[in-house]
UniProtKB/Swiss-Prot annotation:
Catalysed transformations (reactions): (2R,3S)-3-isopropylmalate = (2S)-2-isopropylmalate
GO cellular-component term (any): 3-isopropylmalate dehydratase complex
GO BP: any one term: L-leucine biosynthetic process
InterPro entries recorded: 3-IsopropMal_deHydase_ssu, Aconitase/3IPM_dehydase_swvl, AconitaseA/IPMdHydase_ssu_swvl, IPMI_Swivel, LeuD
Source organism, top-level taxon: Bacteria
Lineage: Bacteria, Pseudomonadati, Pseudomonadota, Alphaproteobacteria, Hyphomicrobiales
EC numbers on record: 4.2.1.33
Function: Catalyzes the isomerization between 2-isopropylmalate and 3-isopropylmalate, via the formation of 2-isopropylmaleate.
CDD domains: IPMI_Swivel
Protein name: 3-isopropylmalate dehydratase small subunit
Any one GO MF annotation of this record: 3-isopropylmalate dehydratase activity
Similarity remark: Belongs to the LeuD family. LeuD type 1 subfamily.
Native species: Rhodopseudomonas palustris (strain HaA2)
NCBIfam families (UniProt xref): leuD, PRK01641.1
Subunit structure: Heterodimer of LeuC and LeuD.
Amino acid sequence: MDKFTTLEGVAAPLKIINVDTDMIIPKQYLKTIKRTGLGKGLFSEQRYQDDGSENPDFILNKPAYRSAKILVAGDNFGCGSSREHAPWALLDFGIRCVISTSFGDIFYNNCFKNGVLPIRVSQDDLDKLFDDAERGSNATVTIDLPAQEIRGPDGGTVKFEIDPFRKHCLINGLDDIGLTLEKKASIDSYEDKLKTERAWA
């Protein structure tokens, strides 16, 4: 998992509440267990029209937001069924941070496990970030995870809270396997101790 320290990029405003995981990545993309290639399926029912052409009105199809790294979204983002493909699709598209007032619990946890930072902010702060994001490609936003703050294009800041353990994992790029490897020396030492104490076993 790639480390997450500071992220600077365009923020795309998605002013829709209750975006569920089926909207993020529709069920037809769930057959694969590969994490790559899912970016094409991200919001596919909104990004594409029935004939397969792009919907020019959808935010991520607009020129200013095609390379967005940050998504500013309405309340209750990622609700619905458990679908780890949802953060995979965001990440494969290039989005590493989602900002909202609240998230679906399972989606929220899956984001951390896959290197995507979900940030909860107040409604007032979200409205300010929507205003920043609507400035298009001029709306460069910086996410500073060590400092736990969001910096807008005009220098304004929004502080955010994050669990210290999850912060540690993101900054160091540690997924479940990485966490185990981080403790490898302690695990090896414990196993050696057991072998000595229970040589009969």
